[in-house]
Swiss-Prot record:
Induction: TWI activity is required for MEF2 expression. SNA activity is needed for maintaining MEF2 expression. Residues 162-191, 203-241, 332-396, 415-434, 507-540 are annotated as: Disordered. This is Myocyte-specific enhancer factor 2. Residues 207-217, 370-389, 509-520 have a biased composition (Low complexity). One of its GO terms (biological process) is positive regulation of transcription elongation by RNA polymerase II. It comes from Drosophila melanogaster. The modification Phosphoserine is found at residues 95, 98. Residues 3-57 form the MADS-box domain. Keywords: Activator, Developmental protein, Differentiation, DNA-binding, Myogenesis, Nucleus, Phosphoprotein, Transcription, Transcription regulation.
């Protein structure tokens, strides 16, 4: 198609005339530049527009060219518009540089017949595609792909030979040339169509050249086989009752199967790995990419009649750890047989549970954890005369009825009724004066003159302890030693704080609940008994 030529006449429209002027003015100057460079000449171009505006171009210097023009007296060529028109008419209207009159583009009968023929061919092609796919569907454009694949969902019992005739046409006319090997081997998109009476399996939009169980698993077209189509024999009852399954299966990048697994475990492992992909569907196809499967042979008894697994079978599969084996990019390998592969039984994994260590909660919160896991809440340890009952389902707590703290000696008198077991029973023990006397064995009047390195004096004159590490924490004889004098010390003559009372009450509860906890603990959970080193690390 050549350029549209216009008639050389004055342009009446103001806007069109201005646009044409600017365009052709630049064209004339460009031609002058090309002529000056190519032919080594001097050019001076002077243009006055219709609005009396001056535009000039000079290849070198305009004044020098004009001076040279005025001083030139020899005969020379001088042309006007009349001379140009005469020259163009002499050369003919077919000259490449000469314009011609504008011709009207009318629709001739020949052109109209040509367009009608193109439309008819397009309609015939669309009708052939609809007849080839059985008339039940329309061509469907796959996203992110360079080819169009007609997909139909036939009604059960209404398909016939026309379904089988669709695959050669699809493989020859509707599929673009094969993509590069890097795109194919990296794991592309596979479209698996399961009609009610036949199975058409295509990977990356191309049919397999041979059986997938033998040789290379990479799909590709072959000279002799244009499609891979296998017919599954079914009873008339199963044909009417079974609906067609149409799925787009995207094989994920899976890791190789460990070498110590058997053939059924390989199938179950690959099925489970595919069920963990982003396709959330209750029907899972068993056309699964399984690496290193060519060395196994399956018999007729290894396959079930149905080719899908329900959601209960998927949920029964045990979860494998994702980091067992490294990931690798494998090509798609589909298992095609007269019947689909089976849904194998899951592999049971037993993990031995180690027993938990006994709880050791020595905080002065008034709550104690029993060996059976229930918590019994005791009364306030700082109250002078109170009874505490155990929490629901737990062991009983012990109340400190009479707690007396002396100024110069830390001695505790614990006595009163036993705690009532809540829920499951288990009452506490009665406190007596002997237990209180044992708590004050290590207490002495000179304790208050000792200082601890981690303490800092408070504003009231007390030494506020900084919690440190107690090497006797958690042992059975810890309650026999009483509270650690390094934890809470007062200056001589200073009144004792409430923390002494709480620590003494907790020590009584620890001592009285220790026999009850020892009876419930087994040989494995019981802590080790060691002889207490009373003299080590304690000041006198």
């Amino acid at each position: 198609m050549g350029r549209k030529k216009i008639q050389i006449s004055r342009i009446t429209d103001e806007r069109n005339r201005q646009v044409t002027f600017n365009k052709r003015k630049f064209g004339v100057m460009k031609k002058a530049y090309e002529l000056s460079v190519l032919c080594d000449c001097e050019i001076a171009l002077i243009i006055f527009s219709s609005s009396n505006k001056l535009y000039q171009y000079a290849s070198t210097d305009m004044d020098r060219v004009l001076l040279k023009y005025t001083e030139y007296n020899e005969p020379h060529e001088s042309l006007t518009n009349k001379n140009i028109i005469e020259k163009e008419n002499k050369n003919g209207v077919m000259s490449p540089d000469s314009p011609e009159a504008e011709t009207d583009y009318t629709l001739t009968p020949r052109t109209e017949a040509k367009y009608n023929k193109i439309d008819e061919e397009f309609q015939n092609m669309m009708q052939r595609n609809q007849m080839a796919i059985g008339g039940a569907g329309a061509p469907r454009q796959l996203p992110n792909s360079s080819y169009t694949l007609p997909v139909s969902v036939p009604v059960p019992g209404s398909y016939g030979d026309n379904l089988l005739q669709a695959s050669p046409q699809m493989s020859h006319t509707n599929i673009s040339p094969r993509p590069s090997s890097s795109e194919t081997d990296s794991g592309g998109m596979s479209l698996i169509i399961y009609p009610s009476g036949s199975m058409l399996e295509m990977s990356n939009g191309y049919p397999h050249s041979h059986s997938p169980l033998v040789g290379s698993p990479s799909p590709g077209p072959s000279p002799g086989i244009a499609h891979h189509l296998s017919i599954k024999q079914q009873s008339p009852g199963s044909q009417n009752g079974r609906a067609s399954n149409l799925r787009v299966v995207i094989p994920p990048t899976i890791a190789p199967i460990p070498p110590n697994m058997s053939a059924p475990d390989d199938v179950g492992y690959a099925d489970q790995r595919q069920s963990q992909t982003s396709l959330n569907t209750p029907v899972v196809t068993l056309q699964t990419p399984i690496p290193a499967l060519t060395s196994y042979s399956f018999g007729a008894q290894d396959f079930s009649s149905s080719g899908v697994m329900n959601s209960a079978d998927i949920m029964s599969l045990n979860t494998w750890h994702q980091g067992l084996v490294p990931h690798s990019s494998l090509s798609h390998l589909a298992v095609s047989n007269s019947t689909p592969p089976p849904a194998t039984s899951p592999v049971s994994i037993k993990v031995k549970a180690e027993p938990q260590s006994p709880p050791r909660d020595l905080s002065a919160s008034g709550h104690q954890q029993n060996s059976n896991g229930s918590t019994g809440s005791g009364g306030s340890s700082s109250s002078t005369s109170s009874n505490a009952s155990g929490g629901a389902g737990g062991g009983g707590a012990v109340s400190a009825a009479n707690v007396i703290t002396h100024l110069n000696n830390v001695s505790v008198l614990a006595g009163g009724p036993s705690g009532q077991g809540g829920g499951g029973g288990g009452g506490g023990s009665n406190g007596n004066v002997e237990q209180a006397t044992n708590l004050s064995v290590l207490s002495h009047a000179q304790q208050h003159h000792l200082g601890m390195p981690n303490s800092r004096p408070s504003s009231t004159g007390h030494i506020t302890p900084t919690p440190g590490h107690d090497k006797y924490e958690g042992y059975p004889y810890r309650a026999l030693m009483g509270h650690n004098p390094r934890w809470n010390l007062n200056f001589a003559g200073a009144p004792s704080s409430d923390q002494d009372v709480r620590l003494a009450a907790v020590a009584v509860q620890q001592q009285q609940q220790q026999p009850h906890q020892q009876q419930q603990l087994g040989d494995y959970d019981a802590p080790n008994h060691k002889r207490p080193r009373i003299s080590g690390g304690w000041g006198t």
